[in-house]
Amino acid sequence: MWLLLAVFLLTLAYLFWPKTKHSGAKYPRSLPSLPLVGSLPFLPRRGQQHKNFFKLQEKYGPIYSFRLGSKTTVMIGHHQLAREVLLKKGKEFSGRPKVATLDILSDNQKGIAFADHGAHWQLHRKLALNAFALFKDGNLKLEKIINQEANVLCDFLATQHGEAIDLSEPLSLAVTNIISFICFNFSFKNEDPALKAIQNVNDGILEVLSKEVLLDIFPVLKIFPSKAMEKMKGCVQTRNELLNEILEKCQENFSSDSITNLLHILIQAKVNADNNNAGPDQDSKLLSNRHMLATIGDIFGAGVETTTSVIKWIVAYLLHHPSLKKRIQDDIDQIIGFNRTPTISDRNRLVLLEATIREVLRIRPVAPTLIPHKAVIDSSIGDLTIDKGTDVVVNLWALHHSEKEWQHPDLFMPERFLDPTGTQLISPSLSYLPFGAGPRSCVGEMLARQELFLFMSRLLQRFNLEIPDDGKLPSLEGHASLVLQIKPFKVKIEVRQAWKEAQAEGSTP
């Protein structure tokens, strides 16, 4: 027994002991590190990690490293270095590390978001972008789809008769239906049990990802039971069962003459690969049902929670700044009025609303730390050596809260995105990357920006958003997972009197 224990400990020591680096190379300054546990004892344990990493810059500078188990992670907290990683050397840092919980979520790095660099990731990212291109014009135009769901949402809110409600569920339904239309060309009904199941799955996944899972740091612990891993497996299984039912129906009824959604594009690519009508990068094995499910799962996971969360953050900040809300509504009244629906072309005229959206994305970034990248070759950042296989994380929170780049970064100031006249949108700093950049940038950025503008302009056109009668304002602290979520809150929603009067006049013979 003692011999087995000794062998086990020696094996651990070999696996987790810091490896020798290249002789003479200059590396990022590192936190202290111990055998087996790495820098874990020296990392702050309390508070939000993105803020803790930002705080460590005071001692270690805008680029530093630490070890978790056997892995070295480099943390980036300056826009110039971040742009080098994401843009200038985007291909060199386009890998994704293997992480136990994310491996389950992505079915061993399938899909787009968590897939490692390679033919599979490149193919599925290209196909997803092709799907979004379907929705540029005509009956499938993205703007039309978003406005349909925004109208359904507003009609529901009008039935609440001024009650204070949590926007999470109706917002999630609206955004889920937009994603569903892009993926499958159909929408869920409010009472559909599949919709509730999808929402529960997303909540469960985010709950697991919001916790520190030791197995992510020490893969050797996989021999022991883990409640977090079991929960993740259950969520992914439920999600795949729901999506697989849709996939099989779509495959049965598929016609190459009618390509109208992401699933059609994936199936057509599979047909082409099977018939040898595709390029060498479209291997049929990369388009199995499991690969398709992972990609659809990524689009649902990333597309629903992110947009829903940002809209709630915008509403929360408007509740804290009622005079700003009033100014935005005045702009909407003067520029759009009440007889037509806001359109994307209004974005350059409703500049205060657009500046408010951009400021929310700055002060409360969707992903305060971007999904980790991985060096796929030996490379460098600045004059520092980065070995192949090193994880690299961009701390978006640090970029968006740097006092060197932003005046009073902790204050909510939409005017920072406007010129001195307040009539033109500007880009005040390069230290602003709400959707990432480069080869790993968010594939749904265009969709998200349109959703945020159209939903908020429609809501503010029709409703007054007020603090509930109990006077309780939403907390602006947030809860970090892959997505920076706002804590649950309620908002009192009343149909604007000016809207009522305009509708009454419009219905008069």
Curated annotation (Swiss-Prot):
Gene3D superfamilies: Cytochrome P450. Heme binds at C442. Pfam families: p450. It is found in: Endoplasmic reticulum membrane; Microsome membrane. It catalyses: a C21-steroid + reduced [NADPH--hemoprotein reductase] + O2 = a 17alpha-hydroxy-C21-steroid + oxidized [NADPH--hemoprotein reductase] + H2O + H(+); progesterone + reduced [NADPH--hemoprotein reductase] + O2 = 17alpha-hydroxyprogesterone + oxidized [NADPH--hemoprotein reductase] + H2O + H(+); pregnenolone + reduced [NADPH--hemoprotein reductase] + O2 = 17alpha-hydroxypregnenolone + oxidized [NADPH--hemoprotein reductase] + H2O + H(+); 17alpha-hydroxyprogesterone + reduced [NADPH--hemoprotein reductase] + O2 = androst-4-ene-3,17-dione + acetate + oxidized [NADPH--hemoprotein reductase] + H2O + 2 H(+). Substrate binds at N202. Its cofactor is heme. It comes from the Eukaryota. Regulated predominantly by intracellular cAMP levels. The 17,20-lyase activity is stimulated by cytochrome b5, which acts as an allosteric effector increasing the Vmax of the lyase activity. GO terms for cellular component: endoplasmic reticulum membrane. Its EC number is 1.14.14.19, 1.14.14.32. Pathway: Steroid hormone biosynthesis; Steroid biosynthesis; glucocorticoid biosynthesis. CDD domains: CYP17A1. InterPro entries: Cyt_P450 (IPR001128), Cyt_P450_CS (IPR017972), Cyt_P450_E_grp-I (IPR002401), Cyt_P450_sf (IPR036396). Belongs to the cytochrome P450 family. A cytochrome P450 monooxygenase involved in corticoid and androgen biosynthesis. Catalyzes 17-alpha hydroxylation of C21 steroids, which is common for both pathways. A second oxidative step, required only for androgen synthesis, involves an acyl-carbon cleavage. The 17-alpha hydroxy intermediates, as part of adrenal glucocorticoids biosynthesis pathway, are precursors of cortisol. This is Steroid 17-alpha-hydroxylase/17,20 lyase.
